[in-house]
């Protein structure tokens, strides 16, 4: 029985606006099993959907995130797959309660003004006998040729996208989550593995397509069909691709030759940004191009910047320990990274625990180390992320033109030695413009001069070095000194004090 009396009509009425590409997107990625447990020492204990309603919904609202992304809730036999080896494409996992309990959780997020994105895996399925593999004793759902049908990375099987029945099964599953569970978006997992016949395969392990290429023509047609059907029937939702290659037009409409997704994860930004921030600050001057590079291809797609679960597992170390320096510098660097992320164009995605500087890699068997919030450094980092979420919501320049070319402008990329970087974010109204100044070294820079067009009066709206964020609180800009240097171009010189390893945002 799937009957439920929904009470989220206000959200559903407005969600086209909340899910639009010119709306703020800050997404909190959550694994329900391990966010918080009723008994942190018992790895078999789970909070129910009803308990999550009491615990998770108020937390996400208080933090200011616009959306939550749930790692796969579709039924799956093995906890250790994190949900990515699903067997029930039409069922939320019964670990936490009934389908109606899950509907009530989605409804609670909607009533709190928070969108719900579901991780969805149409790329492969496990070989469990009670699942889809050899469903009727033959290769029903998977390709019979194991060069196409077997996934070496995950020891799983790949859907046969050539079969109309299989395509119908998967598209029906996507529609089911939008229709029955009021999902606001699907984050489609491992799209690259669907697109490429030679994904994770060496020569001889794959066969080219009929044109001699490495693209899976049937999977490409399925993806286009999926997105066309979704946006035709649910025009106010989003589909988001996790796609790690440079496949063109992933988030371009199908009529323009694209795959038709609404957004795509910006894996290149994530790799370059983490590589840069891992560097000792003295080395950063030699790697400033990494910063400029993201904007060289940013407008190719509608990008979302992901700091996801994949970056804090398998020995990659938690975010705080990726940062160089002593304890204070690690936290200052991480606040600086998050400030850069939240002022860079595009959607944002942050995995649970990243917001307060978890000191351990994520482990699906245990809850997050919430006891860290007893330490001012972690508690104040969380406050900083909260304020960045609200800065994003409250400043139109950070989202109105996030996918439009004139929404961003480099102001200063020339001071490599000092590693000071300045850019402008533009809204529809010029008075909403923001100047973002990032100081990537542990050196305070007083009276730093910035030359920019605009107005005579600027005020500081964010400073990552405030005492309330565990910063020094010594360097701030109540009223920057501004003077007109060129009347014709309305060019102003703005004097700013820059904190060590700090970000300053002026309006």
Language-model segments: residues:
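Substrate-binding/active-site clefts of carbohydrate-active enzymes
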Residues: 9, 14-25, 31-215, 496
């Amino acid at each position: 029985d799937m009957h439920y009396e929904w009470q989220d009509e206000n959200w559903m009425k407005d969600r086209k606006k909340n899910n639009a590409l010119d709306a703020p997107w800050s997404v909190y990625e959550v694994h329900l099993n391990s966010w918080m447990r009723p008994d942190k020492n018992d790895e078999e204990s789970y909070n129910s959907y009803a308990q999550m309603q009491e615990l998770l919904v108020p937390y996400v609202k208080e933090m200011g995130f616009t959306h939550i992304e749930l790692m796969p809730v579709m039924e799956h036999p093995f906890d250790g797959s994190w949900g990515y080896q699903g067997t029930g494409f039409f069922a939320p996992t019964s670990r936490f309660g009934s389908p109606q309990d899950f509907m009530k959780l989605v409804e609670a997020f909607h009533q709190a003004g928070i969108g719900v994105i579901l991780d969805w895996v149409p790329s492969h399925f496990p070989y469990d006998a009670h699942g889809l593999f050899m469903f009727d004793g033959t290769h029903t759902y998977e390709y019979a040729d194991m060069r196409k049908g077997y996934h070496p990375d995950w020891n799983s099987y790949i859907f046969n996208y050539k079969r109309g029945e299989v395509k119908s099964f998967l598209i029906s599953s996507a529609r089911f989550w939008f229709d029955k569970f009021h999902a606001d978006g699907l984050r489609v997992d491992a799209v690259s593995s669907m697109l490429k016949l030679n994904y994770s395969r060496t020569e001889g392990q794959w066969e080219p397509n009929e044109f001699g290429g490495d693209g899976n023509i049937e999977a490409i047609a399925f993806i286009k069909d999926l997105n066309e059907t979704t946006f035709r029937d649910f025009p106010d939702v989003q589909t988001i691709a996790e796609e790690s290659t440079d496949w063109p037009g992933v988030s371009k409409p199908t009529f323009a030759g694209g795959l038709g997704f609404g957004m795509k994860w910006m894996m290149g930004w994530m790799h370059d940004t983490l590589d840069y921030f891992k560097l000792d600050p003295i080395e950063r001057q030699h790697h400033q191009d990494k910063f400029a590079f993201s904007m060289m291809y940013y407008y190719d797609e509608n990008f979302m910047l992901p700091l996801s679960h994949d970056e804090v597992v398998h020995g990659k170390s938690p975010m705080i320990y990726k940062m160089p320096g002593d304890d204070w510098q690690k936290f200052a660097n991480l606040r600086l990274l998050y400030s850069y992320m939240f002022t860079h164009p595009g959607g944002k995605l942050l995995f649970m625990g990243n917001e307060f500087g978890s000191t351990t890699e994520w482990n699906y068997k245990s809850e997050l180390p919430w006891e860290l919030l007893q330490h001012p450094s972690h508690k104040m980092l969380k406050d900083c992320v909260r304020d960045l979420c609200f800065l994003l919501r409250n400043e139109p320049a950070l989202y109105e033109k996030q996918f439009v070319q004139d929404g961003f402008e480099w102001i200063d990329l020339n001071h490599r030695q000092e590693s000071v970087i300045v850019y402008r974010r533009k809204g529809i109204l010029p008075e909403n413009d923001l100047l973002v100044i990032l100081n990537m070294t542990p050196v305070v820079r007083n009276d730093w001069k910035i030359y920019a067009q605009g107005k005579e009066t600027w005020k500081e709206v964010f400073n990552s070095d405030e005492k309330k964020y565990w910063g020094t609180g010594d360097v701030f800009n109540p009223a920057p000194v501004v003077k007109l240097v060129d009347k014709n171009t309305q060019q102003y010189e703005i004097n700013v004090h820059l904190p060590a390893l700090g970000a300053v945002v002026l309006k």
